[in-house]
Amino acid sequence: MKKNLLFFGALVSAFLLASCSGGSKSKAPVASTADIENATEVIKYYNTSLGVLKDMVKEKDVNAVLDYMEQKGKVPALTAIAPPAVVAKDSATVMNPGDYFNRETRQNLVQNYAGLFKARAEFYANFDTYLSYLKKKDVTKAKQLLDANYQLSTQMSEYKQNVFDILSPFTEQAEQVLLADSPLKEQIMSVRKMSATMQSILNLYARKHMMDGPRIDLKVAELTKQLDAAKKLPAVNGHESEMKSYQTFLSQVEIFIKQVQKAREKGEYSDADYDMLTSAYETSII
C-alpha cells in the first residue's frame, strides 16, 4: 500500500480539477466562508491521518515480526529493529486536531492516536527484548512477549480502524460543502467511500493470527452495497474522460470483492492473498 494514497489523491484531484473547469452548476445552497474553511481543514486533517496511519503501522512489517517470533527451535539471528519512520510534523498534527471538530471528537482522536503510538512503541520494544531473551535462551519469557505482541498488533489495528470510523462522517460532511458545485460530486464521494471501505477490509484481513471473519464479511457487504449504488449514478455530460476513469474504478472494486471472497473461503491469512488484495486495491485507485 505504499502508493495507494497518492493514487487515490490523484484520482480525486483530477475529478476536482475537471469539475472546476466547466459543466453544469448545482443549485446547492452557498456555504459560508467559515463552513468552507472548516471543511478544508477537516479534509487536510483526514489526508494527514491517512499518511500517518500508512506509515505508522505497516501490516506486512508487523506480521513479519510475528512470524519471526513464532518460529520454534533455532532461528536466524537478528539485530534490534526500529519501527517505520513517521514525519514528526504530521504526528504532531494528528495529535492536535483543531476546533473544526467538536470537543468529543477531538478527545476521541487524541485518545486513539495516543493509544496507537503507545501500542506501536511497545510492540517494537517487546521485539527487541524478545531478541535479548533468545540470546539468553530464556524461551519462557520470550514466549510471553509473543503473546503480548499478538495483543498489541490487534490493538494497533483497532486504533487505526477507530480513527477511520471517527473521521468518516466528518469527511463526508466536508465533501458535501467543498463539492457543492461539482457535477462530479456524487462520483467523487462514492470513490472516497469505497476506498475507505477497502482500506478497512485490508486492515482487518491483515490480522494474521486472528482473522475477524464476521467483520470482514460485514465490510464486504457494505462495499457491495456502495458499489451497487455507485453503478446507478448517471453519467455526467462533458466529463467523458473522468467518467471512463470512474467506470474503471468500479470494475476494479468488483475484482477486489471477488478476491476478498476467495481469500475468505480459505479461512486463514496468507501473505500471497494479502499481496493479491493489496494489488487489487492499488490498481483500483491508480
Outline where the language-model segments fall.
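Secondary-structure edge/capping motif, primarily at the C-terminal ends of alpha-helices
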Residues: 53-67, 98-104, 127-138, 174, ...
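A cross-kingdom marker for long, charged
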Residues: 221-286
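C-terminal motif of bacterial Sec signal peptides marking the signal peptidase cleavage site
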Residues: 16-19
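Bacterial signal peptide processing site
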Residues: 21-24
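N-terminal Sec/ER secretory leader and immediately downstream segment
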Residues: 37-145
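Polar/charged, Q/E/K-enriched amphipathic alpha-helical segments with strong coiled-coil propensity
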Residues: 124-154, 263-278
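Extended amphipathic alpha-helical interaction segments
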Residues: 142, 146-247
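Bacterial N-terminal signal peptides that target proteins for export
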Residues: 1-8
